[in-house]
Structure formats: structure tokens, C-alpha cells
Amino acid sequence: MKLGKHTWTKPQLLLLAAFAAYVWVQLWCVRWYDPWRDVSQAWCIVRDLSIPQIFAQLRYEGHPFLWYALLWPLAKLGLPFESILVLSTALMVGAAAVLVRFAPLPWYAKAACLFSVPFIYYLPTVARSYALAGLLLILCAALYGVRHTRPLRYAAVLFLLCQVHVMLCGFVGFLMAQWALEMLARSVRAKKLAGVDAGALALMAG
């Protein structure tokens, strides 16, 4: 099937339909979900406190500043409490778009991921910082293969992951340690190859 300049295959159309259905389900959940008390707590913090006061409050919370930074302008602009649900849903719709576009999986596996319990309920609907974690984790996976050629992008995603929840710091620390060891191994290998090349040139010159 050809739409505009792009010819769509049947799997692509099925995946597009699955993505559209996923977005519709998320909008339906935003309409009917009744937020829990801790969701309201995060909203009250950004609504009632200044930026310095929020930083002082963080010592009692399990979330670093990033989630509150996203909520703060919504609350200060006078938007209704339900906007936190819209934000959470938008983050996971973005995560779903990255998954659909970049995941090296067959279309039916991607569709199955979209309609899994974490994608449908736990990450977007509960409206906590976990939606932000979902988006950043998928971005991390998408950038993992180019971490050596585009290190700044990969490092930025890892940094943001640390700002989502304290529980993610250990996971990020493991990825950073692995990455550092890989770069060290690449550096040692490059020096050895340079030494071999220099020796070969010396022999040829002699």
C-alpha cells in the first residue's frame, strides 16, 4: 500500500494500527483513572513549594528532581491536577513510538510489548515518574549500539535515568562501569595495533 511517497508493507500497517490502538487505550485510561495518594503528593509538592523548597523536600522523597521539574511548570501555570496524567501518558506514547521505530523485533513482538501490562497500566496510567523511566530506558536501549560513536547522547540518557528514581542509580552505575571497561579495552587494543603498525613500518624502512 502506498501512502504519499512511502510504500507501506502489511506488517508496517498492522504495527501502525496497533500503535494507534495503544494511543486510544491510553487516552481512555486518562479519562477514567483515579490517581493514588502518592501521585497527588508529587503534584502538591510542585504546586505549593518553590524550587529551593522542592530541593529541600527531596531528602524525604524517593525521586530526584527531574520528575518534579516536569510537573512544576504545569502546576505553576494553573493547569488542573489531571495534567499529570496527560504528561505520564505522553511520555509513554513517546516510549512506544521509539520502540515501534527502532526496536530490532518483528512487528508482532512490538505489538505485544505495547499491550503488555507495564506499557498499558503500570508505567503510563499510574502517573508516577516510572513513565519517564520507561521512555529513558527505551532510549537507552536504542542508543546502546551507538554508545561508542555517539557517546554524548548515550551519556545524557544515563544521566537523566539517575534523576528519575534512586533505585535506577545502581542500574546506571553498572552500565557506566561496563561502558568504561569497554572503552579501556578499545584503547588498549588500539595502542597494540598502533605498535604493530609502527613495527611493521620500521621493518619495511629498514
Language model region names:
Residues 108-120, 134:
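Transmembrane and membrane-interface helices of multi-pass
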Residues 16, 20, 86-108:
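Transmembrane-helix motifs of polytopic, lipid-linked glycan transferases
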Residues 138-153, 183-187:
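Membrane-interface transmembrane helices that cradle and orient dolichyl/undecaprenyl
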Residues 10-39, 205-206:
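Transmembrane signal-anchor helices characteristic of membrane glycosylation enzymes that use polyprenol
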Residues 125-131:
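Short acidic/glycine- and proline-prone juxtamembrane loop motifs at membrane-interface regions
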Residues 2-4, 171-206:
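Perimembrane helix-loop-helix junctions
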Residues 119-123, 138-139, 151-177, 203-205:
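Membrane-interface alpha helices of multi-pass inner-membrane proteins
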Residues 43-47, 51-86, 90:
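Short hydrophobic/aromatic helix or loop-helix immediately within or flanking a transmembrane segment
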